[in-house]
Amino acid sequence: MKKLLGGPGTVCGLLLRIGQCASAAASIGVMVSAKEFSVHTAFCYLIASMGLQLLWSFGLACLDVYALRGKKDLQNPILVSLFVVGDWVTAMLSLAAACSSAGVVVLYEKDIKYCNTQSQYPCLRYEVAVALSFVTWIQIAVSSHVTFWILASV
């Protein structure tokens, strides 16, 4: 198998997973700190999706640390297949959550101008949480493409 930058068991792969954890946790934190987020289903889905992403990325980051400390090779076909499926599933869920939440934010901000008339409504926090979820998705997309290409090189 090819050793690609950002693959499982590499320092770059560990940094990608840590970035995914950090941006997913930040997205959850900002969204939860906004009042009345639970009224909107898309925002609840964003929190659930980012929570799953956080758990998946944290688990793989721990596995990367284990592999790096013990000089283990994580790039065998069975493990990489698991990484590919998990990464693609979480990537699709994260993208769906980010897009649906962005749709709600655009509706309130631009279309019905609810944010202009309701000054106490936390539109900026919603926007930041959605932006962080897109950052998370970009990072998981990179990871999923790298693991896919590693699997394809078997």
Swiss-Prot record:
Q: Where in the cell is it found?
A: Cell membrane
Q: How does it sit in the membrane?
A: Multi-pass membrane protein
Extracellular compartment spans: 32-42, 99-129
Disulfide bond annotation, renumbered to this chain: none
Protein's UniProt keywords contain Transmembrane helix? yes
Keyword RNA-binding: yes or no? Answer: no
Transmembrane region positions? 11-31, 43-63, 78-98, 130-150
Which stretches of this protein does UniProt put in the Cytoplasmic compartment?
Answer: 1-10, 64-77, 151-154
Tissues/organs with expression? Expressed in the stele of the root.
- Which GO cellular component terms are attached? plasma membrane
Q: Which UniProt keywords apply?
A: Cell membrane, Membrane, Transmembrane, Transmembrane helix
Q: Which PANTHER family match?
A: CASP-LIKE PROTEIN 5B2, CASP-LIKE PROTEIN 5B3
Q: Which family does it belong to?
A: Belongs to the Casparian strip membrane proteins (CASP) family.
| Quaternary structure and interacting proteins, as annotated | Homodimer and heterodimers.
* Name assigned to this protein: CASP-like protein 5B2
